[in-house]
A protein has these predicted regions:
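Active-site micro-motifs of SAM-dependent methyltransferase domains
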Residues: 34, 60, 100, 124-125, ...
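Conserved hydrolase catalytic core segment
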Residues: 90-127
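Conserved catalytic-core motifs of eukaryotic protein kinase domains, centered on the activation segment
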Residues: 38-40, 64-69, 128-130
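Conserved small/polar residues in nucleotide/adenosyl-binding loops
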Residues: 131-140
């Protein structure tokens, strides 16, 4: 599924089911340098069990356009904008690794928009190596 957020195209895997605004929304947020592919099995499961399941590619990742966002706060605001862009008032969030930091921040900033929060493989903020950043920037 493709849609626009802040003028940039966003790609989100729907788990093999069409998006239906009547169904509750779950947004899956991947870790640093990863993509929607992190969530292949999870999105499919929830899509086939009554949910709108969106595994988004953050800007500058995977099939989404735009520059990579520079802070957890920017990413959290972007996730809130995704909820608006797909026409929902609230969503459940699932984060992995850096996606945990993003979803926690989003929940803190927009509590009325977040129904539930699930975290997998999260950690506190850690320094990122130059090699990791360079590989992401050049998409090696």
């Amino acid at each position: 599924m493709k849609f626009k957020v802040n003028g940039h195209e966003v790609f989100a895997s729907t788990g093999g089911r069409p998006f239906d605004k009547k169904k509750p929304l779950i947004i899956f947020v991947h870790g640093s340098g990863l993509t929607h592919m992190t969530w292949v099995l999870q999105t499919r499961y929830f899509a086939f069990h009554g949910y709108n399941s969106l595994a988004v590619d953050l800007p500058g990742h995977g099939l989404s356009s735009g520059e990579s966002l520079k802070s957890i706060e920017e990413m959290a605001d972007w996730v809130s904008d995704v909820i608006d862009a797909v026409g929902h008032k609230e969503a459940s969030l699932v984060g992995h690794s850096q996606g945990c930091l993003v979803t926690v921040e989003c929940t803190s900033r927009y509590p009325s928009k977040i129904k539930t929060l699930s975290l997998m493989g999260g950690a506190g903020a850690i320094p990122v190596s130059y090699t990791h950043l360079r590989a992401h920037e050049t998409r090696i």
